[in-house]
């Protein structure tokens, strides 16, 4: 079994040297991701495609490979194929017939052929010969070239024949790390998750900067979003998660700054702090989830004033998107449920926020801050490799005395906290045990209604979400919660 990875068309349009560099990077990225599934994954680069071979004795890897290939930037689509050899057009037909005889019963069909290499026949000749043979020797209704019930896709590569089993759409975009690094200001909401994804897709290694306004619970929620984005779409590369304690900044703004200027000044302080971090780690640009007119600080005038506080490039990929379009995109990339579960933390709320800030007034207000305020908070920032979030959760759970168990006692109840789509795709089966389903984004509100005399075991497939949720509940004072890792 093989996967043929087709490059995104924009890569194919590049010059020979750039195309070669992008293809090499994509090959490396695919190998880095798939080796986390199977150390023996075979990845081979060709000029216009990348071949991935699934070990013959490991058919269970097919779906896992397909899922991950569909989430790697730079891929237009992937076709899963069975590989054969042939010595004539009739030989091709003889191999196709037994595979499709039953599937064609009562259906219209057509045959499509893509061909690479020198042959004594044309692609259309193969289509006609194979299609005519199938039409005569099966119970098919007939050939239909437009909108058939079944399309038989064949690829001929020199002396090899590939029969397409299925097609997986890719992300598109450019391979990770073909563009320079960016630092995404992430809050855990709909906007910052989608804006981060846009730059991952565009091939920029995306690091995360979180300004903590809402305490440890807020940080736990934001880490869930960042970890999901990295694990799903950017796992081929290491990235940083930076948490900056911002409570002191909020306090000074509330105590010292004119009410109407608070929102713009808060954003300027964030940009200055993020700029210092970006300079420290050699990052080329900041990314925000701002959208024009969505809130008072996001008018053109205010965005211009915010930009004046730094020489670093500030990128706003969502600037012209409607809120519903952003939410729809978050649903596609899997961050919608996370965003729903994170409250809006507005540490700075102006009663009459300005929509036309004046730079001179803003700068005069900023003189009221304590000396070296921004430098001091940046010095307190915590920087971790994002892959270590799972390890960090283990340590925090141990410190909080929350157990991780591998078996379920009869008196314990398992709560499957996966999103509905994941739970339906791969249901948790524990014969003789009680299993409840509460999606993680509803757990914080529904857990209080559960029987406090019962011990609940939180379950998710990777174990990260269950640990994060257990930490959150323990911090809320619950002691009847554990993590279930079978």
Curated annotation (Swiss-Prot):
Domain of life: Bacteria
EC number assigned by the record: 2.8.1.4
Family statement: Belongs to the ThiI family.
Broadest EC class assigned to this enzyme: transferase
Disulfide bridges in this chain: 346-460
Name of the encoding gene: thiI
Record SMART domains: THUMP (SM00981)
Record keyword Transport present: no
Domain Rhodanese as annotated: residue spans: 408-486
Protein's name according to its UniProt entry: tRNA sulfurtransferase
Keyword terms: ATP-binding, Cytoplasm, Disulfide bond, Nucleotide-binding, Redox-active center, RNA-binding, Thiamine biosynthesis, Transferase, tRNA-binding
Organism in which the protein naturally occurs: Shewanella denitrificans (strain OS217 / ATCC BAA-1090 / DSM 15013)
Claim: DNA repair is one of the keywords in the record: no
Catalysed conversion reaction: [ThiI sulfur-carrier protein]-S-sulfanyl-L-cysteine + a uridine in tRNA + 2 reduced [2Fe-2S]-[ferredoxin] + ATP + H(+) = [ThiI sulfur-carrier protein]-L-cysteine + a 4-thiouridine in tRNA + 2 oxidized [2Fe-2S]-[ferredoxin] + AMP + diphosphate; [ThiS sulfur-carrier protein]-C-terminal Gly-Gly-AMP + S-sulfanyl-L-cysteinyl-[cysteine desulfurase] + AH2 = [ThiS sulfur-carrier protein]-C-terminal-Gly-aminoethanethioate + L-cysteinyl-[cysteine desulfurase] + A + AMP + 2 H(+)
Catalytic center residues: 460 (cysteine persulfide intermediate)
Domain THUMP: start-end pairs: 63-167
Pathway(s): Cofactor biosynthesis; thiamine diphosphate biosynthesis
Subcellular location(s) per record: Cytoplasm
Principal subcellular localization: cytoplasm
GO cellular component: cytosol
Record-linked Pfam families: Rhodanese, ThiI, ThiI_fer, THUMP
Gene Ontology process terms (BP): thiamine biosynthetic process; thiamine diphosphate biosynthetic process; thiazole biosynthetic process; tRNA 4-thiouridine biosynthesis
PANTHER family per record: TRNA SULFURTRANSFERASE
């Amino acid at each position: 079994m093989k996967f043929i990875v087709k490059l995104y068309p924009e890569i194919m349009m590049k010059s020979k040297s750039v195309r070669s560099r992008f293809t090499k990077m994509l090959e490396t990225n695919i190998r880095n991701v798939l080796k986390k599934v199977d150390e023996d994954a075979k990845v081979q680069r060709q000029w216009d495609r990348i071949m991935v071979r699934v070990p013959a004795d490991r058919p269970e890897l097919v779906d896992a490979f397909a899922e991950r290939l569909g989430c790697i930037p730079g891929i237009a689509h992937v076709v899963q194929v069975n590989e054969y050899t042939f010595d004539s057009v009739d030989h091709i037909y003889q191999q196709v017939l037994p595979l499709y005889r039953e599937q064609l019963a009562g259906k219209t069909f057509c045959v499509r052929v893509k061909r690479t290499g020198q042959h004594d026949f044309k692609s259309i000749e193969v289509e006609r010969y194979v299609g005519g043979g199938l039409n005569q020797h099966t119970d098919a209704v007939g050939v239909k070239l437009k909108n058939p019930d079944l399309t038989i896709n064949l690829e001929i590569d020199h002396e090899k024949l590939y029969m397409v089993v299925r097609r997986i759409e890719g992300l598109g975009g450019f391979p990770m790390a073909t563009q320079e690094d960016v630092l995404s200001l992430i809050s855990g909401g709909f906007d910052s998750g989608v804006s981060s994804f846009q730059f991952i897709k565009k091939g920029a290694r995306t690091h995360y900067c979180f300004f903590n306004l809402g305490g440890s619970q807020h940080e736990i929620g934001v880490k869930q979003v960042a970890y999901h984005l990295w694990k799903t779409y950017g796992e081929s590369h290491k990235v940083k998660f930076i948490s900056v304690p911002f409570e002191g900044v909020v306090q000074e703004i509330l105590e010292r700054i004119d009410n109407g200027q608070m929102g713009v000044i808060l954003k300027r302080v964030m940009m200055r702090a993020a700029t210092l971090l970006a300079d420290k780690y050699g990052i080329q640009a900041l990314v925000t989830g701002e959208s024009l007119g969505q809130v008072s600080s996001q008018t053109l005038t205010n965005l211009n004033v915010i930009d004046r506080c730094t020489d670093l490039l500030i990128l706003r990929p969502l600037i012209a998107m409607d809120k519903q379009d952003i939410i729809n995109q978050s649903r596609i990339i899997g961050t919608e449920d996370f965003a729903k579960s994170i409250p809006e933390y507005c540490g700075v709320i102006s009663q009459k926020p300005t929509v036309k800030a004046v730079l001179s007034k803003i700068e005069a207000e900023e003189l009221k801050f304590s000396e070296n305020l921004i430098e001091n908070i940046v010095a307190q920032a915590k920087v971790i490799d994002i892959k270590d979030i799972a390890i960090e959760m283990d340590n925090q759970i141990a410190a909080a005395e929350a157990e991780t168990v591998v078996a379920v006692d009869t008196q314990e109840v398992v709560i499957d906290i996966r999103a509905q789509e994941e739970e339906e795709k791969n249901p948790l089966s524990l014969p003789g045990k009680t299993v409840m389903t509460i999606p993680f984004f509803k757990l914080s509100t529904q857990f209080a209604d559960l029987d406090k005399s019962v011990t609940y075991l939180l379950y998710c497939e990777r174990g990260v979400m269950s640990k994060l949720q257990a930490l959150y509940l323990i911090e809320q004072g619950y002691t009847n919660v554990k993590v279930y890792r079978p």
